[in-house]
């Protein structure tokens, strides 16, 4: 049997998600999370054959130690799994305009990822550390980079050019790039299957809702507009990010209130969104609990979150012309029947009718349509970015 297993690595600034999948069918052999990098309680958790495991990585461990643990402590006891690995696939948040599709990693690709680091300062440097750690531990296996931004490279210039002096784009690449592309690609493709349509003739609006959140208009299988911009800060209200605001607020904070630019950046990225509005938490589950208990801040945060999302969804009918379905995905999108119902009720102009039983059933990994028969379609599709990364890795290695 030919080898089809891919180790997928998703390196964050203080964590590393990993999984080994069969790229042909998405079958997950092992999955895990290494977290708390740089702290005394750095640890790793993984699931193998239905059993959960946890271990300490050692105080102040980080990406390299995590990859070494995967190789020397976990896979050393799984020679069959390790022997069937054909590639290592890496999720890369930002590829700028340099990368319009997935690529096998070489020195030029590493340089390109590094050049894009200013556009994703928390993510791209961590990706590079993870790639180098994987290269050291798996010197004979090809490494593949799969970019979150690549799916959005099909956007027309009217969607990605900001109304700033054009030379800022021409000389410095300042434009909309978008994120979560791998997720939007997967769920839009799965939506076409669920609708029984050819992906090239399917128009959907995908809402990837997690601590980071974005909406994408997908026309005929291609991204034609998306809510995140130059960076992941633009667009929807998120866990700790503000999303859209009047840019003059930055000027006001600096010149009238005495903030430094670094403080403003931290405020908008880490102190705003659901956390900032509610003054309670960035976790949507906590927001929903507060809402149920009548907490004013949580209620306001939830209402603003849903209102902003509904406005974006409505606006994305413009580039589509015809809407076949709204697709909810991501941790919040897949599990919050409350938010889905609120958003669809705000879109009453489109005559969505939520089926309460279907909506409640479509949680915890369950896929399904959540609107009534005869109503315009809204559905939940659990995302699987790891499978897309594994598929692309296998395809490139077999080229």
Curated annotation (Swiss-Prot):
Name of encoding gene: ackA
Binding site for Mg(2+): 10, 385
Location of the protein in the cell: Cytoplasm
Domain of life assignment: Bacteria
Protein name: Acetate kinase
Assembly with partners or alone: Homodimer.
Principal subcellular localisation of the protein: cytoplasm
Catalytic activity line of the entry: acetate + ATP = acetyl phosphate + ADP
Family: Belongs to the acetokinase family.
Pfam families named among the record's database cross-references: Acetate_kinase
Function: Catalyzes the formation of acetyl phosphate from acetate and ATP. Can also catalyze the reverse reaction.
Cofactor comment: Mg(2+). Can also accept Mn(2+).
Species annotation: Shewanella amazonensis (strain ATCC BAA-1098 / SB2B)
Site (Transition state stabilizer): 180, 241
Catalytic residues, chain numbering: 148 (proton donor/acceptor)
An annotated GO cellular component: cytosol
Chain sites annotated for binding ATP: 17, 208-212, 283-285, 331-335
Pathway recorded for this protein: Metabolic intermediate biosynthesis; acetyl-CoA biosynthesis; acetyl-CoA from acetate: step 1/2
GO molecular-function terms, A-Z: acetate kinase activity; ATP binding; magnesium ion binding
Keywords tagged on the record: ATP-binding, Cytoplasm, Kinase, Magnesium, Metal-binding, Nucleotide-binding, Transferase
Cofactor: Mg(2+); Mn(2+)
InterPro entries, per the entry: Ac/propionate_kinase, Aliphatic_acid_kin_short-chain, Aliphatic_acid_kinase_CS, ATPase_NBD
Gene Ontology terms describing biological process: acetate metabolic process; acetyl-CoA biosynthetic process
KW Cytoplasm (keyword) present: yes
Positions that bind substrate: 91
EC number(s) recorded for this UniProt protein: 2.7.2.1
NCBIfam families associated with the record: ackA
């Amino acid at each position: 049997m030919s080898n089809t297993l891919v180790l997928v690595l998703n390196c964050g600034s203080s964590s590393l998600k990993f999984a080994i999948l069969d790229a042909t069918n998405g079958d997950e052999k092992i999955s895990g999370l290494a977290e708390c990098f740089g702290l005394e309680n750095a640890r790793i958790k993984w699931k193998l054959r239905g059993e959960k495991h946890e271990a300490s990585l050692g105080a102040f461990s980080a990406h390299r130690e995590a990859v070494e643990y995967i190789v020397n402590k976990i896979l050393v006891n799984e020679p069959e799994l390790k022997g069937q690995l054909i590639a290592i696939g890496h999720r890369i948040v930002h590829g700028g305009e340099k990368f319009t599709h997935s690529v096998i990693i070489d020195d030029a690709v590493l340089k390109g990822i590094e050049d894009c680091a200013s556009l994703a300062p928390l993510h791209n440097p961590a990706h590079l550390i993870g790639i180098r750690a994987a290269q050291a531990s798996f010197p004979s296996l090809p490494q593949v980079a799969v970019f979150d931004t690549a799916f959005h490279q099909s956007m027309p210039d009217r969607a990605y050019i900001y109304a700033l002096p054009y030379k800022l784009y021409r000389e410095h690449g300042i434009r909309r790039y978008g994120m979560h592309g791998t997720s939007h690609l997967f769920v839009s493709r799965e939506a076409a299957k669920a609708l029984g349509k050819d992906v090239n003739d399917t128009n959907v609006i995908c809402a990837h809702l997690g601590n980071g959140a974005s909406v994408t208009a997908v026309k005929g299988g291609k991204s034609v507009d998306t809510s995140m911009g130059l960076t992941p800060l633009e667009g929807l209200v998120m866990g700790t990010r503000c999303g859209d605001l009047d840019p003059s607020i930055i000027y006001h904070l600096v010149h009238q209130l005495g903030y430094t630019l670094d403080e403003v950046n931290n405020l908008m990225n880490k102190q705003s969104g659901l956390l900032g509005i509610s003054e309670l938490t960035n976790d949507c589950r906590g927001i929903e609990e507060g809402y149920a208990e009548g907490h004013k801040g949580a209620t306001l945060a939830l209402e603003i979150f849903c209102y902003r999302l509904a406005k974006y969804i409505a606006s994305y009918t413009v580039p589509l012309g015809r809407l076949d379905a709204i697709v909810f995905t991501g941790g919040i999108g897949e599990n919050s029947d409350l938010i889905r119902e609120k958003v669809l009720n705000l879109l009453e102009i489109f005559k969505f009718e939520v089926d309460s039983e279907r909506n409640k059933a479509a949680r915890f990994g369950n896929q399904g349509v959540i609107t009534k028969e005869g109503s315009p379609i809204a559905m939940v599709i659990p995302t699987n970015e790891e499978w897309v990364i594994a598929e692309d890795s296998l395809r490139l290695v077999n080229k």
